[in-house]
């Protein structure tokens, strides 16, 4: 689900923290991709002309494999070295959100049965899409054959992607979930795995510029995310994005915000959930269950050509001609990606406080003038 309204807050208050770029901009970059989110996108977006999912002759769904194969090839074509991170066991605190999703699925199934219009049926069918263990296992098998590294996180994929980026194993985390910023990834890439036909630029969000532009510490930013609404607990009823930002800036923490709300009867319009586990939610963001990034070794290997043809063509009935063409693109792209970037030959020096303060001032000036300034790489 991510965090409701966070993207809008950043766009309004720190527009210069978001850079919109063509995929070619990231030539030579290593990127950790939220695999589960990507597979969900593929199952929804990769469809036949009649709107149904792609299937082979046996009726098995292949949309996830088609999407994974060709979207990965597109990244490789553009010199990006992707690695994928799969979700592990969801935290106990997420069970309430999963229960909500189950209830929504039941409601959607009811609407699907009642739908008479074809467009409405397709709409409800897409809402029922769910990534299964089989989808994940087949995607891992495909990546193994392609020579693309992947890891299974102990818990949330986004937090593991952020960990790899923080440790310098990759340049950025790629996910559509804005809560990835709460794990303090240096950069978050959105829309990286979108279809080329969408013509959607990649949004690169600089976490440090976001924090400085909003004038918040990481802890305060996480508290803001919890107030806006995250996967781990309910939010304060009646508090929207504008009020949430105002409260966290004025009071500095959820503890003091709760104290303020409970101290004045005029604040009764805001409802704090009973037994609100916001501290546990905060802990999941600040101290996530991840594999230490320094202990992870990412290797991109030559593709297993025979294995790919046997799996995709023999078993899944993909076009052999197209798969062989894809294999050649894969081999060529992995070689060209080895060239790397010029800045890869130099040590990356963290931004100083003065540089961050200057960038924050620039962001505020851009907001006042109504102009969005692009940071240069």
From Swiss-Prot:
A single GO BP: maintenance of DNA trinucleotide repeats
Pfam families given in the database record: XPG_I, XPG_N
Major site of localization recorded for this protein: nucleus
Region feature (Disordered): 99-119
Region of interest called N-domain, as start-end residue ranges on this chain: 1-105
Annotated DNA binding sites: 47, 71, 156, 229, 231
EC numbers for this chain: 3.1.-.-
HAMAP family: Fen
Function statement: Structure-specific nuclease with 5'-flap endonuclease and 5'-3' exonuclease activities involved in DNA replication and repair. During DNA replication, cleaves the 5'-overhanging flap structure that is generated by displacement synthesis when DNA polymerase encounters the 5'-end of a downstream Okazaki fragment. It enters the flap from the 5'-end and then tracks to cleave the flap base, leaving a nick for ligation. Also involved in the long patch base excision repair (LP-BER) pathway, by cleaving within the apurinic/apyrimidinic (AP) site-terminated flap.
Assembly description: Interacts with PCNA. Three molecules of FEN1 bind to one PCNA trimer with each molecule binding to one PCNA monomer. PCNA stimulates the nuclease activity without altering cleavage specificity.
Protein name according to UniProt: Flap endonuclease 1
Organism: Vanderwaltozyma polyspora (strain ATCC 22028 / DSM 70294 / BCRC 21397 / CBS 2163 / NBRC 10782 / NRRL Y-8283 / UCD 57-17) (Kluyveromyces polysporus)
Gene (name only): FEN1
């Amino acid at each position: 689900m991510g965090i409701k309204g966070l993207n809008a807050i950043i766009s309004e208050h720190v527009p210069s923290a978001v850079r919109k770029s063509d995929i070619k901009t990231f030539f030579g970059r290593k990127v950790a991709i939220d695999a589960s989110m990507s597979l969900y996108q593929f199952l929804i977006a990769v469809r036949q002309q009649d709107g149904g999912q792609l299937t082979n002759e046996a009726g098995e769904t292949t949309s996830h494999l088609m999407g994974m194969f060709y979207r990965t090839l597109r990244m490789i074509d553009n010199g990006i070295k992707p690695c994928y991170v799969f979700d592990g066991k969801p935290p106990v605190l997420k069970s309430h959100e999963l229960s909500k999703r189950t209830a929504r699925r039941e409601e959607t199934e009811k609407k699907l049965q009642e739908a008479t219009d074809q467009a409405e049926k397709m709409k409800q069918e897409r809402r029922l899409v769910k990534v299964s263990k089989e989808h994940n296992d087949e995607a891992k098998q495909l990546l193994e054959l392609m020579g693309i590294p992947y890891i299974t996180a102990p818990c949330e994929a986004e937090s593991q992607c952020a960990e790899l980026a923080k440790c310098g194993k990759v340049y950025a985390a790629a996910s559509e979930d804005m809560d990835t910023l709460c794990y303090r990834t240096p950069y978050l890439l959105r829309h990286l795995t979108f279809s080329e036909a969408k013509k959607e630029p990649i949004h690169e969000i600089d976490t440090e510029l976001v924090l400085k532009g909003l004038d918040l510490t990481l802890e305060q930013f996480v508290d803001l995310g919890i107030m806006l609404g995250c996967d781990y607990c309910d939010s304060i009823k009646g508090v929207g994005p504008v009020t949430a930002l105002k409260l966290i800036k004025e009071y500095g923490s959820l503890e003091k915000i709760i104290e303020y709300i409970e101290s004045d009867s005029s604040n009764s319009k805001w409802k704090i959930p009973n037994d609100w586990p916001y501290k546990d939610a905060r802990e999941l963001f600040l101290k996530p269950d991840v594999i230490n990034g320094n202990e992870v070794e990412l290797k991109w290997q030559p593709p297993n050509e025979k294995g790919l043809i046997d799996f995709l063509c023999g078993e899944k009935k993909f076009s052999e001609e197209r798969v062989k063409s894809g294999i050649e693109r894969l081999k060529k792209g992995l070689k060209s990606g080895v060239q790397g970037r010029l800045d890869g030959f130099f040590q990356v020096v963290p931004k100083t406080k003065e540089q961050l303060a200057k960038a924050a001032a620039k962001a505020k000036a851009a907001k006042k003038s109504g102009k969005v300034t692009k940071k240069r790489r």
